[in-house]
């Protein structure tokens, strides 16, 4: 009786494996990869981020991960949406990006750097001139800057 029961287990395992593999390929991707960069007076940053695969009603994608560097310093983390980078209290990020200009929202996205500093690029429509600005914060040294930058982000095909 044992050999007979054991032989039924192999086809069942194969069937489960086939169903599992089919399910993996049946679902669409849950993330998009982007390449981004910005440059301005005293700053150059670039890298990649991942977003959810579908935009919201305004065409913005939620940024879920980030990597790269700013002025040669490694990015170590993405600032959670709804929170402010240290040194920029009262200005929470929303972590959104889109394919059309302006690509960033008023709140932008934020990230931490390996040297203990932070950055928050955002679209400042109320600034003169309107455009993308990158707030930089160095909390230990109580320094900040906010240069106008040229920002680009594209979805990796």
Features from the language model and the residues they span:
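N-terminal secretory signal peptides that target proteins for export/translocation
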Residues: 1-12
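Generic early N-terminus positional signal peaking at residue ~5-7
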Residues: 6, 17, 35-36
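Compositionally biased regions
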Residues: 6-8, 21, 106
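Short N-terminal leader segment in a subset of presequences, especially plant chloroplast
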Residues: 10, 20, 24, 40-43
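Short, threonine-centered small-residue motifs that mark membrane-proximal processing/anchoring sites
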Residues: 16-17, 21-32, 146-157
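Short, surface-exposed loop and linker segments with low hydrophobicity and enrichment for Pro/Ser/Thr
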Residues: 25-33, 54-62, 90-105
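N-terminal segment immediately downstream of the Sec signal-peptide cleavage site
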Residues: 31-69, 74, 153-155
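Acidic, low-complexity intrinsically disordered segments
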Residues: 76-155
């Amino acid at each position: 009786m044992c050999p007979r029961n054991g032989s039924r287990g192999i086809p069942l395992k194969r069937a489960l494996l086939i169903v599992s593999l089919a399910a993996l390929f049946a679902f669409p991707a849950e993330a998009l990869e982007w390449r981004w960069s910005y440059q301005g007076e005293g700053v150059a940053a670039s890298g990649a981020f991942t977003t959810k695969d579908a935009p919201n009603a305004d065409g913005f994608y939620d940024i879920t991960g980030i990597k790269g560097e700013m002025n040669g310093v490694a990015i170590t983390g993405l600032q959670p949406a709804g929170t402010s980078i240290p040194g920029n209290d009262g200005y929470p990020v929303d972590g959104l990006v889109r394919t059309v200009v302006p690509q960033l929202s008023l709140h932008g996205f934020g990230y931490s750097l390996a040297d203990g500093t932070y950055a928050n690029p955002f679209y400042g429509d109320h600034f003169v001139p309107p455009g993308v600005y990158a707030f930089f914060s160095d909390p230990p040294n109580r320094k900040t800057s906010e240069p106008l930058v040229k920002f680009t982000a594209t979805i990796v095909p």
